[in-house]
Amino acid sequence: MLIFKICFYRLLPLSVLLLAACSALKAPESSSVLKNHIASDEWQEYQHQLKQIQQFQIQGSVAYFSDEKKAYARFFWQQYSPKNYHLLLLSPLGQTEFELKVTNGRVDMAKYKDQGEIKGDAEEILFKLTGIPIPLEHLSRWIVGASSDADEIILNRQSRLKTLIHHKKEQTWKVYYQAYNTKITPILPERLELYLISPNHQDQRMTLKINHWILK
């Protein structure tokens, strides 16, 4: 596995960069939403290219905002197959704060600092440790710009995703694609904003900045 020399900032509440409450969050409004979109040939071809991406490595940064708190971190993600991946979070000194390995959709190993292995669902484990509801089940497809699990989509002028909306139980995820990396083939997302809208009105937002892509 390629090892990146990265400094990672701890996620909330890993005792680093806990800031004051931020202002109320509002997702950008869209003028039109495409349901059951009958896509152009260009869009269909692009999605076909994305489906071929089964393995990748990315490194980048994440910023998290809610009504009460905000946090910043850097991450490393290695995707081996659709249901197999490895996630690392490290301290500024390069020490492993959190490590997660998922095999066939199940947690194979989860470690937090020196507390040993942790059992449970991947999303539940990460939420308990960080307080951030990261949608790991869908994130690997959203990261590459695939719309396979979308309920509603909006395309940009280049026939790539501009907005993706996914409904899960009483929650709604809205993903806004703000920038793409045009130096790689196929062109892949470089900056995303994810909004979680839930009935308790505790709206939450994450910004993902992908600094480096490796495709296999």
From Swiss-Prot:
Q: Name one Pfam family in it.
A: LolB
List cellular component terms (GO): cell outer membrane
Q: Say yes or no: keyword Endoplasmic reticulum present.
A: no
- Identify the InterPro entries for this entry: LolA/LolB/LppX (IPR029046), OM_lipoprot_LolB (IPR004565)
Q: Which PROSITE patterns match?
A: PROKAR_LIPOPROTEIN
Annotated lipid attachment (N-palmitoyl cysteine): C22
Membrane topology according to the record: Lipid-anchor
Q: Where in the cell is it found?
A: Cell outer membrane
The signal peptide stretch is 1-21
Q: Would the keyword Transport be found if you checked this record's keyword annotation?
A: yes
Output one GO BP term.
protein transport
Cite the positions of S-diacylglycerol cysteine lipidation. C22
Q: Which UniProt keywords apply?
A: Cell outer membrane, Chaperone, Lipoprotein, Membrane, Palmitate, Protein transport, Signal, Transport
UniProt family annotation: Belongs to the LolB family.
Q: What function is annotated for this protein?
A: Plays a critical role in the incorporation of lipoproteins in the outer membrane after they are released by the LolA protein.
* Protein name, as recorded: Outer-membrane lipoprotein LolB
Species in which this protein is naturally found: Hamiltonella defensa subsp. Acyrthosiphon pisum (strain 5AT)
